[in-house]
Amino acid sequence: MKNWWLLFIVFVSCSKNAQVYAPVGGLSEEEMGVSKNRAKQLNTMEREQIQEWISKQKEKFYPTQLNYWSNIENLEQRKKKQDGEQVSFQYELYDFDLQKFYEKPKIYKNAPLGKFEELDAIEDAVRYLNPDEETTLLVPSVLAYGTYGDGDQIPYDMPLIIKLKLIK
């Protein structure tokens, strides 16, 4: 019986609490909090800048539930296309000085809704557009390419103007 207790004590005393590390390349809890706070402040600042930009335009823009603006009033009250429906559309990206990022529009043919690898604001707006209808979207960077940019011409933390057209 003494041997069992002795063995038990040896095993228990040898086991150490495993240290918990943040994932390689990951952020600690404190860093996550700082990052979250930065994103929140950036989003608030960009929303204010976009609203100021809107106030200087002749065209009206309307906020959406997804946190972007469209020049179509009551866009989200229209009939919504469902996941799986195929749509064809094109869009062009601009900064708020109306400088175009790419010469040619990005064109997608027969893209199934719900499986987009595009910006969330584009997929959301496409769901409500009618064939051959166009809209202009004002999108904060958090809904655009965020803190990384697109890896090509769009820098990080860049709010975008998106001119979107549903082809069919």
Language-model-derived ranges and their functions:
Residues C14-K168:
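Cross-family detector of peptidyl-prolyl cis-trans isomerase
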Residues M1-C14:
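Sec-dependent bacterial lipoprotein signal peptides
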